[in-house]
């Protein structure tokens, strides 16, 4: 039985790859075709662009939120992890939805490899940091879709 407040595996979710300048956003559902990149949200000195996040939330109406947890290879804490956890808490407070954290190690590398394949196939024209951030968010959602039991419910 899932933890109280956990996200149903068949639910639509928004996933986030949190960076210091941009947040990649993806949408996914187990009933659909995995996950897809949908937006990149700018982060300013005073935090994320909440107006843009509100628009994405309103458009997709997710049942839960999946935030990449940037663990180091030796499972140590780092500033990026603190930033991701703070963002996850803000999401939970703002949208009153369950928020889970999932290991995002190597998600940017996987996103870059996907981008390179799409470029080689002629589906992408040039390397674009925004596209990579959103694609990394799609990788994060796909990890949750394939193994939701490995996610940690935000305390």
UniProtKB/Swiss-Prot annotation:
Write out the similarity annotation: Belongs to the YqgF nuclease family.
SUPFAM superfamilies recorded for this chain?
Answer: Ribonuclease H-like (SSF53098)
Assigned EC number: 3.1.-.-
Task: Please report the organism this UniProt entry assigns to the protein.
Answer: Xanthomonas campestris pv. campestris (strain B100)
Q: Name one GO cellular component term.
A: cytosol
Against CDD domains, the record matches this protein to: YqgF (cd16964)
On whether NAD is a keyword of this UniProt record, the answer is no
Q: Which molecular function terms from Gene Ontology are attached?
A: nuclease activity
| Name under which the protein is recorded | Putative pre-16S rRNA nuclease
Where is this chain's protein located in or outside the cell? Cytoplasm
**UniProt cross-references to InterPro entries, sorted A to Z:** RNaseH-like_sf, YqgF, YqgF/RNaseH-like_dom, YqgF/RNaseH-like_dom_sf
> Which EC class is the enzyme in?
hydrolase
Bilayer-crossing residues are none
Question: What Pfam families does UniProt report for this protein, alphabetically?
Answer: RuvX
Q: Name one GO biological process term.
A: rRNA 5'-end processing
Q: What does this protein do?
A: Could be a nuclease involved in processing of the 5'-end of pre-16S rRNA.
């Amino acid at each position: 039985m899932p933890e109280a407040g956990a996200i149903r595996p068949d639910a639509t979710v928004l996933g986030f790859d949190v960076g210091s300048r941009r947040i990649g956003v993806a949408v996914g559902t187990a009933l659909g075709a995995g996950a897809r990149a949908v937006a990149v949200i700018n982060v300013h000195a005073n935090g994320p662009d909440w107006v843009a996040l509100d628009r994405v939330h309103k458009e997709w109406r997710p049942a839960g939120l999946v935030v990449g947890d940037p663990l180091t290879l030796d499972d140590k804490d780092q500033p990026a992890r603190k930033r991701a956890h703070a963002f996850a808490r803000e999401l939970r407070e703002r949208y009153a939805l369950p928020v889970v954290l999932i290991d995002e190690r190597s998600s940017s590398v996987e996103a870059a490899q996907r981008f390179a394949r799409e470029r080689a196939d002629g589906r992408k024209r040039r390397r674009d940091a925004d596209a990579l951030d959103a694609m990394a968010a799609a990788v994060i959602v796909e990890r949750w879709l394939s193994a939701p039991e490995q996610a940690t419910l935000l305390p």
